[in-house]
């Protein structure tokens, strides 16, 4: 951004209180190292429930090739973060939802039982199996909307399977319940 400022372009920053990134093998290794150091430091916040029939759509149908290339056997969503799979840590950072739609690769379901892990952990869990990867997360989410029977007149929360967020739940619910707000991006 410094180069943009040198060109006299307007640069605005939005500060995020806390964010954890587990998207690459190096990210995961660094996080686990610091986590052990700080005695299992993970995001601890009350999971807020929004009574507006919210659906969570969570794409996790990638190959995880960066991890595979580093010798990891488990798919990225099943890798351990403080005793829980990454996918569970990621979802537990979010508001509670009435409907949870997870889009996974069929091979991860067959070989690693990712569907069982999700179904044991979350109520109203719909695991959609894909035979192959898509062109990206947006395409995967579209499949989740279509095959999951998502009510697009109710709130939909789309998140990733490999990060955690810490947010002000009161402000979030205020935005979510504001009739003038159509989309919240964070």
List the predicted regions and their residue ranges.
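Conserved alpha/beta core of the MobA/IspD/sugar-nucleotide pyrophosphorylase nucleotidyltransferase superfamily
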Residues: 1-56, 152
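Short, high-confidence coil segments that cap the C-terminus of an alpha-helix
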Residues: 9, 97-98, 153, 179-183
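Conserved beta-strand scaffold positions in the cores of enzyme catalytic domains, especially
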Residues: 11-13, 19, 78, 127, ...
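Conserved N-terminal catalytic core of the sugar/cofactor nucleotidyltransferase
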Residues: 41-58, 66-68, 80, 84-158, ...
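The conserved beta1-alpha1 loop
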Residues: 61
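Short alpha-helical oligomerization interface
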Residues: 72-77
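The conserved acidic donor/metal-binding loop of glycosyltransferases
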Residues: 160-164
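Conserved donor-nucleotide/metal-binding helix-loop-beta segment in metal-dependent transferases, i.e.
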Residues: 166-186
